[in-house]
A protein has these predicted regions:
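Ser/Thr/Pro/Gly-rich low-complexity linker/stalk segments immediately outside membranes or between
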Residues: 13-27
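Generic low-polarity alpha-helical segments
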Residues: 2, 153-157, 238-241
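Short extracytoplasmic
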Residues: 26-58
Length: 293
């Protein structure tokens, strides 16, 4: 009883911002590092003796449907954070990869890329899919729009980018390891959620991405524990400063939509690599607000 009262006083009076950090920084970090992920709920409870216990529920978007990825349990004691991940599938399978434009040698992956397009060609019309594509160079978000428009043209509901591979200058591009796991570098989702974190006012998508990077770089210890990466792997401050100087540019995206529409990307001169994620039955229609899988 006394421990619970002390915890409430600690978080609510002296450290309300600390509670927000324990609750909302992990959610922001997960959406930035797990491909095509979105936090849909969960909560954080203050427990005895300065501890908190929280759960974050993650989903992914394939077509217009949301499908459970898993749950991340986060327990904190003062500034220490413990993380436990439980995936909907026994082990979360990483099928989405990117290739940085600096990587020149792609010979070993030509057969894999060919199989991606063949799969999209062979699967039935009534399906939607998730696809990671890499571009021939890094593009601003404004430059990306006409590239996608040239592929899909005017449609009421064209395939939708849901996650972006951000060029931070630190991507591990080499000829002996050309593909970069989508867990390895900084990304950002289509919709960035700051929760109740104190943030600067932003007006553009680019400003929003920079603000996300600023917030995460200021909480590197929490991000490190939540994403289970080392400071050397994250290097958040260095990535933030690079993007702040060079601007928001992306060299790949995760995009979802009707399988046959995604197949059109095969003919784009700007697409140099493709990896296929999940395939689901047709759901390419707008759902009533609040509807979820």
């Amino acid at each position: 009883m006394i421990g619970g009262v002390l915890s409430s006083i600690y978080f609510q009076v002296n450290n309300e911002q600390k509670l927000k950090e324990v609750r909302d920084v992990p959610a922001l970090a997960l959406e930035a590092t797990i491909p095509n992920s979105r936090v849909t709920g969960g909560g954080t409870n203050v427990e005895v003796f300065f501890r908190t216990h929280g759960n974050i529920r993650l989903v992914k978007t394939v077509g217009k449907g949301e499908f459970k990825l898993g749950t991340v349990q986060i327990d904190s004691f003062l500034s220490s954070v413990k993380v436990e991940q439980t995936w909907a599938d026994t082990a979360y399978q990483q099928n989405l990869f990117f290739v940085h434009p600096k990587t020149k040698e792609m010979t070993n992956f030509q057969e894999d890329i060919k199989k991606v397009w063949e799969t999209l060609q062979k699967i039935p019309d009534g399906t939607v899919a998730e696809l990671a594509i890499s571009f021939d160079k890094s593009y601003t978000l404004q430059e990306l729009e006409p590239i996608l428009y040239s592929v899909f043209e005017a449609q009421e509901m064209p395939p939708t980018p849901v996650w972006y591979a951000l060029d931070t200058g630190l991507e591990a591009a080499s000829d002996d390891r050309p593909r970069i796991s989508s867990f390895e570098a900084f990304r950002f989702p289509e919709h960035i959620h700051f929760g109740n974190l104190e943030t600067k006012q932003v007006k553009t998508k680019e400003e929003e991405v920079l603000e996300m990077m600023r917030v995460l770089s200021q909480h590197e210890e929490i991000v490190k524990q939540v994403t289970q990466r080392s400071s050397k792997e994250l290097n958040l401050q260095k990535q933030y400063q690079y993007v702040k100087k060079h601007g928001i540019k992306v060299y790949g995206i995760v995009i979802t939509g009707p399988s046959k529409e995604l197949l059109k990307l095969q003919n784009s001169p700007h697409v140099r690599d493709a990896t296929l994620g999940d395939i689901e039955f047709w759901n390419w229609f707008d759902r009533p607000s609040g509807s979820r899988h």
